[in-house]
Amino acid sequence: MNKIVLYLLVYGATLGAAYDLLKAPSYFEEFLHKFNKNYSSESEKLRRFKIFQHNLEEIINKNQNDTSAQYEINKFSDLSKDETISKYTGLSLPLQKQNFCEVVVLDRPPDKGPLEFDWRRLNKVTSVKNQGMCGACWAFATLGSLESQFAIKHDQLINLSEQQLIDCDFVDVGCDGGLLHTAYEAVMNMGGIQAENDYPYEANNGPCRVNAAKFVVRVKKCYRYVTLFEEKLKDLLRIVGPIPVAIDASDIVGYKRGIIRYCENHGLNHAVLLVGYGVENGIPFWILKNTWGADWGEQGYFRVQQNINACGIKNELPSSAEIY
């Protein structure tokens, strides 16, 4: 038998055996203790257990069917899918539209670049952050790309202020959502962005307290890319740096490790940062930085299979910016 096929069969069998639905009550009690969960009443606890049980069944099914990835009980396991998406993502239409970003059509076939590339290995990606219960993924993904742009240009990692974007971007709607290219446009409108230390994250909408004297990054120009080939993202990634992309996060909530091959694509609701790509056991994958904390996924990152539009990664035009 082919070694890769044998590996996947054994790996899949191991994953499928990891959880037993009949043990849901004991798993739930362990979950409550591990994540310090408290509910307002016994009826609420029962409701949360039923949601937990449903999520556990889905985790077991995913571990049996998606043999290149592993899924687990985590801090979101007592939330319905709709609750998780509404509280911990945040990609949405802005209040008004602007068109500052130049549209670039990438119609040439992909170049024959390296099989693997990862900006983290070059120390050009800041640490994983946690957006909490604020729908500001759009701000984190956009500023994550600017942080990497700054590191590439100045060989220095610096954390930028998502809170400034939340409070002072009057096109997007703060913790109630936004888009990637409009966030770039907002930074251009404001004249720049401050460091996180000067304008700390609060995970809430607040009054704008911007101080132009403390801007550390200024955006010269922004771009949106029309790509005919998903694989063209490799060229773009290597040339311009990490790229914010929009996805459907519905199928990544319980992710633990591995390469996601089966991922819903029913509507974009979350923004993440594309930082690299590679191949494992014959499966080409993208490496994406999430904003759910380093205790989620692969130390805050996840991988999806390339060239199948996993999680709708190709549905929205990717964007980037050029800094001064």
From Swiss-Prot:
Signal sequence residues: 1-16
Q: Does the keyword Iron apply?
A: no
Q: What SMART domains is this protein classified in?
A: Inhibitor_I29, Pept_C1
Q: Which cysteines are joined by disulfide bonds?
A: 134-175, 168-208, 263-311
Q: Which residues are glycosylated?
A: 159
Q: Give a short account of what the protein does.
A: Cysteine protease that plays an essential role in host liquefaction to facilitate horizontal transmission of the virus. May participate in the degradation of foreign protein expressed by the baculovirus system.
Q: What is this protein called?
A: Viral cathepsin
